[in-house]
Amino acid sequence: PYAGPFIIAAILTSIGLTMREIILQINPNKELFLLYLLPVLFLLLIQYDFNYLVQGTIAFLFCLISLNAWMRIKDPRYRLSAALVITPLLFWIGGPIAGLFSLSVVLKEAISRSKQGFYFLAVLIEYLFIGIGSVWSTTITSYRFAFLPDAFYHPILAAPNLIYFAWVCLPLSLIGAFVYPKGKNQSKKKTGIELTVQFILILFLCWVTIPRYNDQKAYPLKVLDYYARTEQWDEIIRHCHGPIKNYLYLTYLNRALAEKGELADRMFAFDQHGPQGLLASWNKTFTVSTLLSDAYFTLGEIALSQEMAFEGYVTVIGAGNPRNLQRLVQTNLIYGTYPIAEKYISILEKTYAYHDWAKRHRGFLYNDKAIEADPVLGPKRKALPKESNLSGINGLEHDLLIRAEQDPENQLPIQFTGAIYLLSKDMKAFQRLIEKYYGTPVLPSLPVSFQEAVILLAEKDVDYWKRFNVSGNVIRKFAGYRNLVVQNRNNPQLPQLIKKSFGDTYWSYYTLK
């Protein structure tokens, strides 16, 4: 989980060190660390924005490296030639970052009062021609993406002002380093004051800006997603104790319970809020599409998992997403559509991080026996509906029950259907479900929450309880629950008492939510 922060820290550190080299070439006798840390701070702040692309920070580093190398060229003719070569290369690598480089080149020549400085305007003109030409040729869709850092933000959203701050800091830092007194023989006291003032200013800016831009609300979601990605189900469950007010968190939690086979037994031990917590509403975003694809895959609804994986792949900013490609590989292997799976595998094989995974899954191509023997793909293929139909057209519960009847050994479809009814408080539908399937291979015994719901269906009919083999522990617990309610009927603290003593039961959920 720390690889990402380490990579970002390494990039930002490299930016700070390269900025220092640039500033020292202009003012070699001063440690003006305020100038070379400001871009680092602003780039750090924009990293917190979910819609920002880290490519923008990498491009900024390439710009600084190029500028630092260019400034070390002494001969103005070679310097001009190098700038004219670097600008199109930077545009090819990082788009509008080439404009920041060309502007810095012209500015550096201007503040250096170079006799040939006028000729360096050709670098800026070259960049303008490249940018305009890229839009005219439709290589880039908008002038905004050719000339502004908006290219490194979600294309359909307006970029925040913060994204421009680091870009503005670079030319201002060049000017600041030039105009600041050189002071070769400056006293230690004055130097100490300068460093202290800069240090205080940096600390103040960090104190003001980091809490403002650091999106702590999104952090728990990122944690849950990491544990889901690495299949650490117990960690997800551990992080979801206490109040939960977000359907996305609940979807992660309920998926973890389902993966462990504990959904119908333990779901009411957590802060449930209706059936939306089983499957969050789809909002056409990459995050929710990916989450739903994973949840449907756990559930065995392969068609819906494939649909959500594709939606996630096409809605993510950038050039697709390997996580969704992995799911598309799996779903197509399960369906036996091997040519499509092979196409996606070929894409993943070209990546560094997913090459081994893709190579391993290539072994499943056109190999039904290998798929059926695989612990992940095999059960999913076995649970596919025998008759072709449109998934979800008659409701998810209808599809789940077809699969439950077809593969009774897999208890998740029937338990998930019951969970939908209980969370919706649709007791009539739940009653029809258990009366039809209880005692059959589809539902040989009732999970704990189902037993608790049976008592609510017929609170005074003990024979009805016996029909569904409600356990003695559940009956004794209900007796305590009923006594608590009767004894505190007029007590305004009754909800708190129920929550404290019976908060992990369906009776508490049914009464209080």
Annotate each predicted stretch with a short phrase.
Residues 157-198:
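Cytosolic-side transmembrane helix boundary signature
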Residues 188-215:
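Internal/C-terminal transmembrane anchor helices
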Residues 20, 67-69, 108-109, 131-135, ...:
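Alpha-helical transmembrane segments
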Residues 100-121:
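Perimembrane helix-loop-helix junctions
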Residues 402-407, 411, 420, 462-513:
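Terminal, low-structured helical/coil segments at or just beyond the last alpha-helical repeat
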Residues 210-381, 405-424:
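Soluble catalytic regions of membrane-associated enzymes that act on cell-envelope
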Residues 31-37, 60, 71-87, 115-124:
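Short hydrophobic alpha-helices at membrane interfaces in multi-pass membrane enzymes
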Residues 2-20, 24-74, 93, 97, ...:
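Membrane-interface micro-motifs in multi-pass membrane enzymes
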